[in-house]
Amino acid sequence: MKALFAAITMAHALLQTQASLQNPNLLPTPPMGFNNWARFMCDLNETLFVETADAMAANGLLAAGYNWLNLDDCWMTHQRAPNNSLMWNTTKFPRGLPWLGSYVKAKGFRFGIYEDAGNLTCGGYPGSLGHEELDARTFADWGVEYLKLDGCNVFPEGGRTSEQQYEHLYGLWHRILSGMPHPLVFSESAPAYFANEKNLSDWYTVMDWVPRYGELARHSTDILVYAGEGSAWDSIMVNYRYNTLVARYQRPGYYNDPDFLIPDHPGLTMDEKKSHFGLWASFAAPLIISAYIPGLSEEDIGYLTNRDLIAVDQDPLAQQATLASRDDEVDVLTRSLADGSRLVSVLNRGNSSVQRVIPLQWLGLNPGQRYQARNLWDGTEKRIRKDLTVTVRSHATEIYKFTGSNGRVDAVSTGIVFNTASGNCLTGDAAGVGFAPCTGGEKQIWQVRGSELRPLSLLGECLTADGTRLSLRPCAGDEAQMWSYHISGNLKSGHEGGCLTEGHGVASCGWELNSQVFGLPSGVRVSGY
């Protein structure tokens, strides 16, 4: 019944609205800019935004592409006006938000704002529930072009489940914004309210519909705020991990948002700051800085304006880097770029320097060819033929762009196939096929050619559905060796339509079950869009 209801709801939504993915020109590349929340929280005002705009225009951030200035929570009064419209806090914004919008636009920025889908914002200010059309018109009248819609204080109504209530409200906002003469960029925070459950079915379900309604979605926990307790690096790694689980959703017009860049957080080393930026760029994620911009160091401005990495982030393919391999300390991520080159990012999660020798085949490249590898941090280049040898400091990320003799490479989608709930890797060798903790190595790295999955440990053999069992057999092109990857994260067999299932081989496909949702390498065709 759940699956039937969702199918009907999805079909109705597609008939009633124009999906954001069908209008990628609204936001053809991920947004870059500034938001006050992680650095200042509710301590925002006109002076902060004027000083931020002035500093970004002077220090090169605006010229580098950081052109959004977005207010977060607490900008409004605690009560609506007699006509039910929202009002800005005149103590914080004495000249008003229309004036502020005009000021930042005159400098070359665009203007964004925050609201909440519930009856109150997270900070206790008026939410938009019941006032959606009025608030949308108000924002447009003020010159707002971007709406971040949070999801605090959303309660089920009309017999809906919590997930259905969120879809109802965010779908309503999408219809309103899409019907405006100049639609606003729509940032959805709905998935974050389902991310920390042991049963991820509702989170997966919300992630299924947010690309239809908005241009980006905050999919998980908030990044650690400046005044917060705990490890800023650990917070970055939590959001990094969540982002690796949802690569299948991203494409031009919709972007997974792992939250703000925090370059002036006192708990981060320079390597950690650069990793944060470099990984987000590798993901083609939004690059929204939350920091005291006038106080950023020259070194911070230097890496934040790295032209090569910004070009990666803004690449028109918008392909998200995915895991080529993973072991106890090191993640290797790859993606293809629009110019035909291959991006390789190597993250050291461990607490000491490591060296890795990474075979080109792990990266989806041909070990018989020569490549030029450009280090995107310092611009140095080296020739690579058989493997990439790299030394990576603790919590650092090395990033390379591989090109062939004609500037392009013929990459094959290659990487781990992992269960996004357990984190375990599909593992195949002469001993059989199953799931195990990810430890790196050829038996956990798969080539995806068309509909076939082949482990690098046995490239002549294909993942095969033997009834409910999995095996490796010589590739013969029959239905039992054909697999299709779906937006739900299901990997479906061409033989009787069962789904890959951790712990059960192949089983009947359920509704967004933890055991049946998988991450695959970038470049694999995703059905269901």
UniProtKB/Swiss-Prot annotation:
Keyword S-adenosyl-L-methionine found? no
User: Any signal peptide, and if so, which residues?
Assistant: 1-19
Q: Residue limits of the Ricin B-type lectin domain?
A: 408-528
Query: EC top class, in one word?
Result: hydrolase
InterPro entries named in the record: Aldolase_TIM, Glyco_hydro_27, Glyco_hydro_b, Glycoside_hydrolase_SF, Melibiase_C, Ricin_B-like_lectins, Ricin_B_lectin
Where on the tree of life does the source sit, at the highest rank? Eukaryota
The active site annotation covers 150, 208
Q: Reaction(s) catalyzed by this protein?
A: Hydrolysis of terminal, non-reducing alpha-D-galactose residues in alpha-D-galactosides, including galactose oligosaccharides, galactomannans and galactolipids
Per the UniProt entry, the Enzyme Commission number(s) are 3.2.1.22
Glycan attachment positions: 45, 83, 89, 119, 199, 351
From the record, give the cysteines joined by S-S bonds: 42-74, 122-152, 425-438, 462-475
Give the GO molecular function terms: alpha-galactosidase activity; carbohydrate binding
Q: Quick one: a GO cellular component term?
A: extracellular region
Keywords per UniProt: Disulfide bond, Glycoprotein, Glycosidase, Hydrolase, Lectin, Secreted, Signal
Which GO terms of type biological process are on file?
Answer: carbohydrate metabolic process
- PANTHER family cross-referenced by the UniProt entry: ALPHA-GALACTOSIDASE A-RELATED, ALPHA-GALACTOSIDASE/ALPHA-N-ACETYLGALACTOSAMINIDASE
Belongs to which family?
Belongs to the glycosyl hydrolase 27 family.
- For this entry, the protein name equals Probable alpha-galactosidase A
State the species of origin: Aspergillus terreus (strain NIH 2624 / FGSC A1156)
Per the UniProt record, the lineage of the source organism begins with: Eukaryota, Fungi, Dikarya, Ascomycota, Pezizomycotina
